[in-house]
Amino acid sequence: MPVVTMKQLLEAGVHFGHRTQRWNPKMKPYIYGARKGIYIIDLQKTVKLIDEAYDFVRDVASKGGTILFVGTKKQAQQVVKNEAERCGGFYVNNRWLGGLLTNFQTIQSRIQRLIELEEMEANGELDKLPKKEQSKLRKTLEKLRKNLGGLKNMRGLPDVIFVVDPRKEKIAVEEANYLGIPIVAMVDTNCDPDPIDYVIPSNDDAIRAIALIASKIADAYLEGREGVPYSSEEAAAQPEEKIEEIEINIPEGIGEEEI
């Protein structure tokens, strides 16, 4: 039973890659063709690979493993936060701090500082401090919340990370590779799929595409934790479709890279 339908992927614009001059040749196996200078991702492969990623994340969760969602580009920030919180995962959606995984002990000390400052804010201790010191600590608190707010309860390294745009999140990918942490990622036509353990060929710039794929990864994690299926009934009811049978229109602005 597929986790997602071809129709859902098409409606979310998952099939739109980047302009043909902005591609990574290693993505060739995942490309169906080109329309008006835009690469079209082979959604039949995407459907299959989402299923594989779903099964893997579900199995990690069923064994008590943890998941970290990573997406710092503006289109991904809110989605990554929402889906991580929904499934009980962790997230980084503002800036990846170098050494976040490879120097996790140091990061943990910063997380502890965040927790301490939030406690001071909650019990009114911050308000009792001199104005200058209070202002300084509030700025520190705001910065820590932005960068580490999604990691407050992460006691150790994650068992899997889900990445939106591994090209942008290059440092996160390198750190996970170094530590042997499996990576599930939305990989667009301009990305290198080689460092990714579970490639999901996908438009990684459209909010709807990011929301759809991230929600399926969160569903997989919830299913593993709770033992209750979260995969789409709509997907189960739909007949198998082929991308050759579907008319593809290219909207204005598709394929443009975020500056």
UniProtKB/Swiss-Prot annotation:
GO MF terms held by the record: structural constituent of ribosome
Q: Name one Pfam family in it.
A: Ribosomal_S2
Q: Which InterPro entries match?
A: Ribosomal_uS2, Ribosomal_uS2_bac/mit/plastid, Ribosomal_uS2_CS, Ribosomal_uS2_flav_dom_sf
Q: Which Gene3D superfamilies match?
A: Glucose-6-phosphate isomerase like protein, domain 1 (3.40.50.10490), Helix hairpin bin (1.10.287.610)
**Endpoints of the signal sequence:** none
Name of the encoding gene: rpsB
Q: Name one GO cellular component term.
A: cytosolic small ribosomal subunit
Organism whose genome encodes this protein: Fervidobacterium nodosum (strain ATCC 35602 / DSM 5306 / Rt17-B1)
UniProt-recorded name of the protein: Small ribosomal subunit protein uS2
Q: Which UniProt keywords apply?
A: Ribonucleoprotein, Ribosomal protein
- Which GO BP terms sit in this record? translation
Per the record, the similarity remark reads: Belongs to the universal ribosomal protein uS2 family.
